[in-house]
Amino acid sequence: MKLLLPLLLLLCLELTLVCIHAEESSSMERNFNVEQISGYWFSIAEASYEREKIEEHGSMRAFVENITVLENSLVFKFHLIVNEECTEMTAIGEQTEKAGIYYMNYDGFNTFSILKTDYDNYIMIHLINKKDGKTFQLMELYGREPDLSLDIKEKFAKLCEEHGIIRENIIDLTNVNRCLEARE
């Protein structure tokens, strides 16, 4: 009987933590205001279990500059490095039937969602790419400033791990050429 009480208390604590985590996730979806993500952003980090996609010269290595919110879509202005030159590109994410889920065609068919944001500092995006019968996932961390605190980067790393991406596959983009000189 003495052993049962501590086990019950531990179980209650675990259930409380699970409920708090679930509430945090669902309140992000429930209270998400897409208009507030509009504006200038900087690419801080990318992660994928297919690391070559986000390494230098990788097809998914892109540097965001701006997100514009339209009625049923998000317009991303970003830069790629092509032949050692910064090249501006625009991609449009169209809203799906499911709230908060968007799709776009870029290097395959992509669906993406915004997992976490505080609107003023950071945004964390989860993307699933399908091309030629293969699927991979990509996580992106954007900041309103050229760099973010270690706390936010750690939050991103934990979110990547929750999605099966190991820390070694997170690339910090703050120390690479992000085409900042190409920004208007």
From Swiss-Prot:
Signal peptide: 1-22
GO biological process, one term: heat generation
Alphabetical list of Pfam families matching this protein: Lipocalin (PF00061)
Residues with attached carbohydrate: N66
Any one GO molecular function term: small molecule binding
Keyword Phosphoprotein applies: no
Disulfide partners: C86-C179
Post-translational events: Glycosylated.
Subcellular location(s) of the protein: Secreted
Keyword line: Disulfide bond, Glycoprotein, Pheromone-binding, Secreted, Signal, Transport
Domain of life: Eukaryota
Cellular compartments per GO CC: cytosol; extracellular space; nucleus
Tissue: Abundant in the urine of adult male mice but absent from that of females.
UniProt keyword annotation of Glycosyltransferase present: no
Role of this protein: Binds pheromones that are released from drying urine of males. These pheromones affect the sexual behavior of females.
Family recorded in the similarity comment: Belongs to the calycin superfamily. Lipocalin family.
Protein name stated in the entry: Major urinary protein 3
